[in-house]
């Protein structure tokens, strides 16, 4: 009996595992250059969990912005810099290396930068919405 239960659990786990995610060009709300893979859920939905993985080239920046929902991030590889506030200031950023975890509560103003190529996994509640402090920084308004 336990073998059939174990087999069922393994089959469920296989359906929920992502082995080699396909990276896609980033959405309209991020500056050009990043690649994004949706691992779980739908970050554009009006509710529900999502997990995405971002691959960022060296020097990639996301200007000061905020999200309406809490955001959790784990650095998979490379170095990911995070700063708080309304003005991008590299001297005030904290560097997170591989394996580092951080979270930002909703509406917290922040900015980020990759130091070397970085892969970051982000998990949160949908929708994943990026609200730029300076509307001129919003790439969706430039396309």
Show the residue positions of the predicted features.
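Double-stranded beta-helix
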Residues: 91-94, 113-143
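Short beta-strand His + acidic residue motifs that chelate non-heme Fe in jelly-roll/DSBH
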Residues: 62-64, 82-83, 104, 109-115
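Mature catalytic domains of secreted/periplasmic carbohydrate-active enzymes
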Residues: 9-10, 71, 125, 133
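Conserved short histidine dyad/triad with adjacent acidic residue
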Residues: 50-67, 96, 106
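Short acidic-glycine-tyrosine-enriched beta hairpin
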Residues: 86-107
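A short, N-terminal "cap"/entry segment at the start of jelly-roll beta-barrel domains
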Residues: 2-48, 135-143
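Glycine- and acidic-residue-biased ligand/ion/polar-headgroup-sensing regions
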Residues: 57-60, 66-87
């Amino acid at each position: 009996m336990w073998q059939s239960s174990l087999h069922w659990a393994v089959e469920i786990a296989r359906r929920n595992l992502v082995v080699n995610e396909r990276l896609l060009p980033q959405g309209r709300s991020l500056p050009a250059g990043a690649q994004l893979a949706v691992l779980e859920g739908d970050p554009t939905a009006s509710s529900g969990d999502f997990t995405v993985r971002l691959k960022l080239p060296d020097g990639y920046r996301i200007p000061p912005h905020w999200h309406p929902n809490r955001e959790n991030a784990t650095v998979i590889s490379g170095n990911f810099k995070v700063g708080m506030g309304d003005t991008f200031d590299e001297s005030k950023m904290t560097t997170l290396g591989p394996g580092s975890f951080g979270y930002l509560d909703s509406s917290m103003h922040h900015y980020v930068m990759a130091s070397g190529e970085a892969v970051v996994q982000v998990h949160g509640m949908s929708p994943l919405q990026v609200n730029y402090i300076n509307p001129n920084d919003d790439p969706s308004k430039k396309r």
